[in-house]
């Protein structure tokens, strides 16, 4: 008698696939026994998962290991060419903007990067540039979009580039290009990229502050290894802190008030600072101003980032890759 698999059984199988693929990407290559040791699954279960993944070319069977007296063990690796990810963000304002992009393999390696002038400043231009990149790199199956504003469930609530305001950007791009799409705000992606490149493994909160040319301030936070988005994706909108004429203050005073607020609320271990109005020379003054309100033992480490570009692109690529892997596993 054949017993149909229930949802719990299906979810267990999916979890096994995710464990094996994540371990393969982390290790580079591995045998069934090595995967069993890392994942906690049995060798037989790892073998069954690898057989399924090999049949759809998601995993590659490599050379046999040199025998130490027994049967040679087969090594496996995740196929970097199984798909590619396009990470892309628009930065600037209605006065001037550009599109910055990168393409990564299924295992995260950078394949190409570039930037494009965002002219004319229309949705049609934005979608046309994405279409051109998809044509140039036909293996792209997932697209991550970053925008300078508030993005709620794939729809842009507000944006420094007003053409995006109110646009259901995820839905429109999925319908137009037929690929997986996710969109989020610039600071969430950038904070995650900084966390992964500089603070990976730290459970204490980490924050990223960006001071652009325009009178506002952006913030992204990672807590317990997760991006803090909030109940309605409004977390990090520090320009709304109740300080009178905050954006009229000298940059050091404005930043210090926000750093003190973050320290009192989430107590971060590290705060990264970036933007055209920030320099490394500003950090000593910032620390001095903060220490007027914060006891020294609670003062976070301040780290200057000359550019947010690599943090931003890494954040988009890693989060999109992770979510697309789950999308594949669940077959959605």
Identify the function of each model-found stretch.
Residues 85-89, 140-144, 205-210, 218:
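Short glycine-aspartate micro-motif
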Residues 93-95, 150-152, 215-217:
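Short, acidic Gly/Pro/Ser/Thr-rich loop/turn segments
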Residues 95, 152, 192, 230, ...:
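Conserved protein kinase catalytic core
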Residues 103, 150, 220-221:
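Hydrophobic beta-strand positions
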Residues 113, 176-268:
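Glycine/GP-enriched mid-protein hinge/lid loop-to-helix segment characteristic of carbohydrate kinases
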Residues 147, 210-213, 275-276:
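Short secondary-structure boundary segments
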């Amino acid at each position: 008698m054949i017993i149909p698999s229930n949802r719990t059984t299906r979810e267990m199988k999916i979890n096994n696939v995710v464990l094996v693929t994540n371990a393969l990407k982390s290790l580079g290559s591995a045998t069934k026994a090595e995967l069993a040791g890392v994942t906690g699954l049995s060798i037989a279960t790892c073998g069954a998962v690898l057989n399924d993944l090999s049949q759809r070319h998601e995993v590659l069977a490599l050379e046999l290991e040199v025998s130490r007296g027994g049967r040679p063990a087969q090594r496996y690796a995740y196929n970097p060419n199984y798909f590619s990810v396009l990470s892309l963000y628009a930065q600037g304002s209605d006065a001037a903007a550009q599109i910055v992009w990168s393409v990564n393999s299924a295992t995260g390696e950078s394949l190409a990067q570039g930037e494009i002038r965002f002219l004319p400043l229309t949705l049609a231009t934005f979608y046309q540039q994405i279409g051109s990149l998809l044509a140039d790199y036909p293996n792209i199956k997932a697209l991550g979009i970053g925008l300078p504003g508030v993005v709620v469930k794939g729809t842009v609530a507000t944006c420094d580039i007003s053409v995006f305001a109110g646009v259901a950007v995820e839905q429109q791009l999925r319908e137009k290009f037929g690929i997986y799409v996710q969109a989020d705000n610039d600071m969430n992606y950038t904070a995650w990229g900084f966390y992964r490149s500089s603070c990976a493994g730290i459970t204490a909160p980490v924050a990223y502050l960006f001071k652009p040319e325009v009178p506002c301030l952006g913030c992204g936070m990672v807590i317990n290894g997760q991006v803090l988005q909030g109940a309605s994706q409004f977390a990090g909108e520090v320009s709304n802190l109740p300080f009178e004429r905050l954006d009229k203050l000298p940059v050091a005073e404005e930043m210090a008030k926000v750093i003190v607020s973050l320290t009192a609320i989430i107590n971060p271990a590290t705060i990264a600072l970036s933007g055209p109005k920030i320099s490394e020379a500003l950090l000593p003054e910032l620390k001095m101003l903060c220490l007027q309100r914060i006891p020294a033992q609670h003062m976070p480490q301040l780290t200057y980032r000359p550019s947010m570009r690599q943090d931003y692109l890494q954040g988009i690529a890693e989060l999109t890759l992770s979510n697309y892997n789950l999308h594949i596993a669940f077959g959605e």
